């Protein structure tokens, strides 16, 4: 039974504006590829850093596309005639009546953007996204656009096809846009009416059918279950207040994330997966992995990846700058002092940030909490799908005899690294490691027998026969080798360095 009715608030763009605007954007080719080609690599990179002038120069002679880039991306005032030509068949007056444009306040009769409307796309497709302008950032209900967190979650989401998907806390709708390419039915929720209005406009502009529901957290979908849930929730730990709806939960510390992790699995179909971003506290005297594990309900596979760790000062300063607060101003210092006092009083030594992958399971759950610090080039989405498959295989081979009877091979893209140290007689081998050159680039140190075992993992012989050969070659009892090897083999399989061979 549904506990919420579809959101019926006023969208930012009425239907009389949506169609003509879509026609104009399509005609002018207002897409990520076209904008990148117009600006060139240098100016496009500068714009990504917030440096507007190089992009303005590059777009100066860009025709109607250049007009839209200067108007909608760079925030410049453009003449009425140029805007009318670029947006035709939509008139500037109708665009202004819908809240997309505003008359310039310089008396020129020109127009400026009242909303952020930008192209967005990747291998999933091309879209347009509506959000608030950065200059509105001080407003409590500010709706952010395609930011770093949105991109991080999108790149980490498993894209295997599913029947139903929930985008919890949709904001301007970025995750739901992607979901429309791999989910048959998409539901998006948000607490903020302004976010829902902008998301509705984004979906309409892209001709997407998304069910929109208004309400906090999981209340709008009470009693419902989904094949996949994605969420970029308000995860910034701090005092129990809401300065900005998009980032502050209203609950102290990481309490909101803890409650969400505990409640989400009940809204998953059997085998369903939830993927979300989150931040957790490193509290004095506590082990942070144990803290996060304690939030998990029974019957859930979980993979928690810590991607970044910030000390309290860095945490507060980062989010002040994100909100456009000058940390050196009197107001900024007072705001920081209150936040830092709260963190200190709660015994917080650091704040972690990362990914949480939760899967509803009927089997013995697998829970892995680990660090993945530093930059990685490849998206994590395929890795999440692979990790879940490998967990299933390991669960089916949980008994030692089952694992010993399996045939394994070193995965493509895995290398053996050896390093040496200088000694009295030259270089001396100091150690070795196997490492993936793709995905998370997991790396495991190995000794000489382990390296020899991996060299034999070619999918021809089962693991028990390889260990017998290794026992003979290194004069070590096979039972001792089995006891030492099986935990490491399971970890290498889990990290994708060893793959099962049918």
Predicted region positions:
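Acidic, low-complexity/disordered tracts enriched in E/D and polar residues
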Residues: 2-67, 136, 363-455, 499-502
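Hydrophobic alpha-helical segments that drive targeting, anchoring, or assembly
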Residues: 10, 27-115, 133, 138-147
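Long, charge-rich, low-complexity alpha-helical segments
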Residues: 64-115, 171, 185, 358, ...
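SAM-dependent Rossmann-like transferase core, predominantly class I methyltransferases
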Residues: 102-165, 170-178
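Conserved SAM/SAH cofactor-binding pocket of Class I
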Residues: 147-231, 237
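Conserved Class I SAM-dependent methyltransferase catalytic core
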Residues: 192, 253-306
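Mobile active-site "lid"/loop adjacent to the S-adenosyl-L-methionine
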Residues: 193-194, 233-259
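Flexible, glycine-/basic-rich loop-and-beta segments that form/coincide
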Residues: 312-391
